[in-house]
Amino acid sequence: MGFVEGEVEIQQPGGSWRKASEDQSLAIGDRVRTLPGSTARLEFPWTAIAVGDGSEVALQNQRVLTLRLEIGRIDIDPEQTLLQVVTAEATVSGSGRTLVRREGGATFVGSYNGGANVEAKGAIVRLGVNKGTVVKTDGPPAEPLAMGPAPKIIAPGADPRYVKVAEAVRLKWKGPETAYHLEVLSIDSDVPVVSIDISALEYELRLPWLGTFRWRVAGRTGPVESEPSGEGLICVVEK
């Protein structure tokens, strides 16, 4: 567990759910879940995975390192090539920054860099840059389609907003969807420290860490997400 923000729990085989902590080791068979408004980061020697809020994942005992997504959303670092993700509907492998979201008996896979492979019912599709596919129960992957148009951020934008630790900053954007996914990332990482679903066009964010952060949003309709927006900047200072 490389990072824990909010309420994150871990369950070992045969055990009960208990509070997770940063730097806690994970073993095959362990399960991790995030409560609403919370984010976790799973770190491996060659990659990292952001687990969005309201999600549950499990490390499976397979020949290839396998992470099972039961529900919710994960965002896989671009450097990954040795990890596969499975859901009840699909198997995801390959390379490049990839998001996998499962809800309502369907799995959506989006590839930001290209290179993700999605397999179901004996059929395989390879996703290009900013392409996505949906896999429904007992069906093959749908033909890859371009991810929808990105929302537009309003504030803060390219000019950084300076705030103190835990001071509120209101994020605003516009787009046609009624639901969105918000990500906040440190300036030097592609793995989010905040990864949450929102049903609004603004959000009051409080960051407990010093440093410079980027934020972006993607529209969502069910499990399907749009391209992410451009990025705004937030600088958290001591005073």
Q: Which sequence ranges carry the predicted segments?
A:
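Flexible, surface-exposed loop/linker segments and immediately adjacent secondary-structure boundaries
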Residues: 1-159
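Beta-strand signatures of extracellular beta-sandwich domains
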Residues: 9, 181-185
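Short, solvent-exposed loop/linker segments at the N-terminal edge
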Residues: 161-165
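Conserved aromatic anchor
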Residues: 167-177
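Short beta-strand segments within Ig-like beta-sandwich modules, predominantly Fibronectin type-III
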Residues: 193-199
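Extracellular fibronectin type III
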Residues: 224-236
